[in-house]
């Protein structure tokens, strides 16, 4: 699967770019007002008690700000943060080494926490609940268990698949926060802020247009802005104008609803090849040359959310809204 302009996942070359745009405190964070309000209370209460914040589970689609929020939590609590990904923790010893290096109150951020192995996850149980871990030293008859006490800390776990977490792990988080897709007003505000960080001027109409096509995701909004800025600079315009924005988005193949060429390919398959469906995912996968799991996890969710596809017992079916949007397919 090639990197897409509207892909919600982080592209490998975008890490430093995203870091430069991330807000560092809650007051700078745009959107997710319910989460912000709750975190403000939880953090203030923890600081008044002089205790670490309860363990926090952040879940929701990619690109909505889970990593940013984890860093904001550490900044607001005025503590250090250690960041790891679930798949990188192969053995219990890997996690034990990280936990034993934490200072009192520190934040441990585990991204993709749903991908922890069961043996590593079990080490977390006592660490989260009672702040100790048991490590087995030696093998066979000489094996013995050593208890290591840990300083109180805050675990922040992030996942796009909250349903994949085991009950015992999920229940050990005191704070559960679901990140929702952003509305266009919040995305527009993010785009204007990013333009300022990039020292780029953008007109109001362009910011609105980019927000409409960003699939409710700040990461997509910032990526599109960065590419439109390329067109503006090559054109030697003093700012990003709506004409340049529309031209750039057309060339980037991102339509008015935020759909790209792969979305179009999939919808064309359902509408034209299979008369709007219903058609099974395996059949769609073969027809467009993609894996079923990629369609199910990456392409399909946004199309369902936007009302282009509906799930039926017999397969996927194009909606009336989809026919209206793609009415020029056969012309």
Swiss-Prot record:
Region annotated Small ATPAse domain (RuvB-S), chain positions: 183-253
Location of the region described as Head domain (RuvB-H) in the Swiss-Prot/TrEMBL record: 256-331
GO molecular function: ATP binding; ATP hydrolysis activity; four-way junction DNA binding; four-way junction helicase activity
GO CC annotations, alphabetized: cytoplasm; Holliday junction resolvase complex
Residue ranges of the region described as Large ATPase domain (RuvB-L): 1-182
Principal cellular location given in the protein's record: cytoplasm
Binding residues annotated for DNA, in chain numbering: 292, 311, 316
Sequence positions that bind Mg(2+): 67
Single biological process term from Gene Ontology: DNA repair
UniProt cross-references to SUPFAM superfamilies, sorted A to Z: P-loop containing nucleoside triphosphate hydrolases, Winged helix' DNA-binding domain
Catalytic reaction list: ATP + H2O = ADP + phosphate + H(+)
Enzyme class: hydrolase
UniProt cross-references to SMART domains, sorted A to Z: AAA (SM00382)
Compartments it resides in: Cytoplasm
Gene3D superfamilies: 1.10.8.60, P-loop containing nucleotide triphosphate hydrolases (3.40.50.300), Winged helix-like DNA-binding domain superfamily/Winged helix DNA-binding domain (1.10.10.10)
Protein family: Belongs to the RuvB family.
Subunit annotation: Homohexamer. Forms an RuvA(8)-RuvB(12)-Holliday junction (HJ) complex. HJ DNA is sandwiched between 2 RuvA tetramers; dsDNA enters through RuvA and exits via RuvB. An RuvB hexamer assembles on each DNA strand where it exits the tetramer. Each RuvB hexamer is contacted by two RuvA subunits (via domain III) on 2 adjacent RuvB subunits; this complex drives branch migration. In the full resolvosome a probable DNA-RuvA(4)-RuvB(12)-RuvC(2) complex forms which resolves the HJ.
The record's note on its domains: Has 3 domains, the large (RuvB-L) and small ATPase (RuvB-S) domains and the C-terminal head (RuvB-H) domain. The head domain binds DNA, while the ATPase domains jointly bind ATP, ADP or are empty depending on the state of the subunit in the translocation cycle. During a single DNA translocation step the structure of each domain remains the same, but their relative positions change.
Role noted for this protein: The RuvA-RuvB-RuvC complex processes Holliday junction (HJ) DNA during genetic recombination and DNA repair, while the RuvA-RuvB complex plays an important role in the rescue of blocked DNA replication forks via replication fork reversal (RFR). RuvA specifically binds to HJ cruciform DNA, conferring on it an open structure. The RuvB hexamer acts as an ATP-dependent pump, pulling dsDNA into and through the RuvAB complex. RuvB forms 2 homohexamers on either side of HJ DNA bound by 1 or 2 RuvA tetramers; 4 subunits per hexamer contact DNA at a time.
Name of the protein described by the UniProt record: Holliday junction branch migration complex subunit RuvB
Primary gene name: ruvB
């Amino acid at each position: 699967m090639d990197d897409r302009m509207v892909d919600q996942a982080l592209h490998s070359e975008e890490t430093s770019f995203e870091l430069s745009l991330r807000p560092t405190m809650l007051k700078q964070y745009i959107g997710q007002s319910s989460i912000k309000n709750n975190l403000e209370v939880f953090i203030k209460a923890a600081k008044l008690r002089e205790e670490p914040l309860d363990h926090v589970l952040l879940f929701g689609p990619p690109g909505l700000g889970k990593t940013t929020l984890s860093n904001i939590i550490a900044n607001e609590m005025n503590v250090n943060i250690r960041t790891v990904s679930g798949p990188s923790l192969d053995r219990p010893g890997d996690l034990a080494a990280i936990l034993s290096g934490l200072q009192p109150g520190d934040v441990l951020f585990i991204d993709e926490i749903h991908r922890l192995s069961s043996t590593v996850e079990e080490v977390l149980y006592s660490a989260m609940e009672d702040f100790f871990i048991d490590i087995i030293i030696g093998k066979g008859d000489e094996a013995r268990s050593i208890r290591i006490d840990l300083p109180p800390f805050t675990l922040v776990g992030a996942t796009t698949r909250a349903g994949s977490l085991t009950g015992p792990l999920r229940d050990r988080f005191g704070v559960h926060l679901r990140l929702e897709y952003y509305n266009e007003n919040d995305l527009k505000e993010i785009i204007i802020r990013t333009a300022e960080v990039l020292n780029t001027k953008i007109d109001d109409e362009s910011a609105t247009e980019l927000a409409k096509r960003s699939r409710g995701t700040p990461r997509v909004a910032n990526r599109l802005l960065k590419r439109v800025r390329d067109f503006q600079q090559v054109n030697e315009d003093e700012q990003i104008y709506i004409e340049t924005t529309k031209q750039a988005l057309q060339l980037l193949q991102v339509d008015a609803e935020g759909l790209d060429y792969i979305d179009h390919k999939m919808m064309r398959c359902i509408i034209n090849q299979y008369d709007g469906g219903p058609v099974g995912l395996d059949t769609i996968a073969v027809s467009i040359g993609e894996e079923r799991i990629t369609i199910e996890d990456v392409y399909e969710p946004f199309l369902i959310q936007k009302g282009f596809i509906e799930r039926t017992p017999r397969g996927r079916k194009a909606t009336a809204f989809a026919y209206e949007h793609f009415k020029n397919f056969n012309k």
